């Protein structure tokens, strides 16, 4: 599963870990992306989305129907 939110587009951040002796190694900070199922009443079916915690708040605020419309307007297949 990729670590990209389908609602917000949030993806991993990259940087360096710095040890006590200042050796630097590459690392990445993954967003909290979960695979969640949502019911679409207009279509009478459930869809599965990869959603970050901020994406869940957006769905709670705007509603699943409008969020799915925006995702489809971007050209993503659901």
UniProtKB/Swiss-Prot annotation:
The keyword Ribonucleoprotein is annotated on this UniProt entry: yes
A molecular function GO annotation: structural constituent of ribosome
Region called Disordered, residue ranges: 1-28
SUPFAM superfamilies from the UniProt entry: L28p-like
Key words, A-Z: Ribonucleoprotein, Ribosomal protein
Record GO cellular component, one term: ribonucleoprotein complex
GO BP terms, alphabetized: translation
InterPro entries: Ribosomal_bL28, Ribosomal_bL28/bL31-like_sf, Ribosomal_bL28_bact-type, Ribosomal_bL28_sf
Domain of life: Bacteria
NCBIfam families linked to this entry: L28
Family affiliation: Belongs to the bacterial ribosomal protein bL28 family.
PANTHER family recorded: 39S RIBOSOMAL PROTEIN L28, MITOCHONDRIAL, LARGE RIBOSOMAL SUBUNIT PROTEIN BL28M
Name this protein carries in UniProt: Large ribosomal subunit protein bL28
Protein source organism: Corynebacterium diphtheriae (strain ATCC 700971 / NCTC 13129 / Biotype gravis)
